[in-house]
Amino acid sequence: MKNRKYIIRVVGILTVGLLLVKMTYQFKYSTFIFDLIFFSGLVIIGLVFLIWSLFSDLKHFRAEKKIISLIPIGIAIVFTTTIWVWNTQINSNFDKPTLVRIFYDGGFNGTGIDFKKDGTYIIDNSAIGLSDFIYGTYEINGNRIILDKKALENVVVTNQLEIRPKIIEYSDRTETDNIVYQIDEEGNVIKNSTEFRLVIDNRE
């Protein structure tokens, strides 16, 4: 019976740990609300296996002095460390200081591009409960932004963007807003391309 429970703990920790590691890696590129709920459930199950292992396997190790008794705990520590490191790296990308942030609101979906001060960017292509992320690098010269990719997710159709003022007329007033346009090599706005609002501008 003791060996059977030990095998259950090892298999359980391996299964839950591998699933959590896989999902943590996938969260760098995509998040879905039901995946987050499933991830939270796996964390709870993993904690149950870990607590069970801490009480049972440490007790057996003290009594038998066999290193094999600590294998489940060791596996759990490896998985926990891996998940923590990857999660820290993912969050560090999002936490970098923003230079410019632009956004397109499509109603039920939207696309935001966060241009970081270190020359990297993150595209967040979102819909209800779902976000897909794309990473890349860029260069900025005045109001022109040059991306490392020619096209991105059927939203950005060029590698050149430009910040330009746009006069917006309302029934009772007229305002000037900064819009980010997609342009070609000659600087012409590409017809029917998505326009972005400039929501954060930390340029000096």
Identify what each model region corresponds to.
Residues 2-117, 122-134, 141, 148-204:
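Lipid interaction determinants
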